């Protein structure tokens, strides 16, 4: 039996397309109930850049934080395109993270995030089509070199883009992606690891001279 606060499944009509529209945060859905499952149409997907995946989605033990998207290779000035048709919700700059970035809102609670632009090519509330240029690649914000940080979010939850898209082929793995809340929670939860410093001091050995036994 489902818990009261959880819906069994949602459709496009269940998500308010204007929810949190004026919220400046990337995740503006913190007050929304997350359904157990949802079917998301991703058939329109277009590669934002023709680059390879240089860093995947997941927990980074070295930095002790989640990487909530993937990084795609590009050169500064390369055109970055909208992955799906939608409306521009955020055009902003974040020095300690995304740098120059854009958030696009799509159907049914889906949003995409594009980070580290050298230049924005769209304005807030602009309607864009899949494949339309939205920015130029760069290395602004927390970045060690030119690349595109790309996220696919559902109701604010950062999904694994590589579970939805085959980035080698540049096409969605399935036209309809099924979101599963329990699977997401298990996948996105970092493994509990012990980061306390281990005692690396070598054990003291007994180097005392042994008595020679007379023959």
Model regions and ranges:
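Extracytoplasmic
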Residues: 12, 31, 39-40, 48-50, ...
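Conserved, short, structured surface segments that act as functional micro-motifs
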Residues: 100-106, 126-183, 187
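Solvent-exposed coil/turn segments that connect beta secondary-structure elements
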Residues: 58, 75-77, 85, 93, ...
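A residue-level detector for short acidic-glycine micro-motifs
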Residues: 55, 74, 90, 116-119, ...
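Short, glycine/small-residue-enriched coil/turn segments at secondary-structure junctions
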Residues: 38-46, 61-93
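Surface-exposed strand-loop junctions at beta-sheet edges and helix termini
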Residues: 74, 83, 122-123, 128
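Polar/charged, compositionally biased leader and regulatory segments
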Residues: 1-57, 172-215
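Zn2+-dependent peptidoglycan hydrolase active-site motif and core
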Residues: 65-68, 82-121
């Amino acid at each position: 039996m489902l818990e009261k606060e959880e819906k069994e499944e949602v459709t496009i009509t269940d998500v308010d397309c204007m929810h949190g529209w004026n919220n400046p945060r990337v995740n503006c859905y913190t007050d929304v109930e997350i359904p157990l499952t949802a079917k998301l149409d991703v058939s329109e997907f277009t590669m934002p850049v023709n680059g390879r995946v240089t860093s995947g989605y997941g927990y980074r033990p070295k930095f002790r934080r989640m990487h909530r998207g993937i990084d795609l290779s590009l050169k500064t000035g390369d055109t970055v395109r909208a992955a799906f048709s939608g409306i521009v919700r955020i055009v902003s700059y974040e020095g300690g993270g995304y740098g120059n970035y854009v958030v696009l809102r799509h159907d049914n609670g889906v949003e995409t995030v594009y980070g580290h632009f050298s230049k924005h090519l769209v304005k807030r509330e602009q309607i864009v089509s899949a494949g339309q240029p939205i920015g130029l690649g760069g290395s602004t914000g927390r970045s060690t070199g030119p690349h595109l940080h790309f996220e696919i979010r559902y109701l604010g939850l950062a999904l694994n883009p590589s579970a939805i898209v085959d980035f080698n082929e540049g096409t969605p793995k399935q036209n309809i992606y099924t979101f599963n809340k329990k699977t997401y929670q298990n996948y996105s939860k970092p493994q509990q690891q012990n980061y306390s410093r281990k005692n690396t001091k070598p054990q003291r050995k007994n180097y005392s001279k042994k008595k020679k036994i007379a023959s």
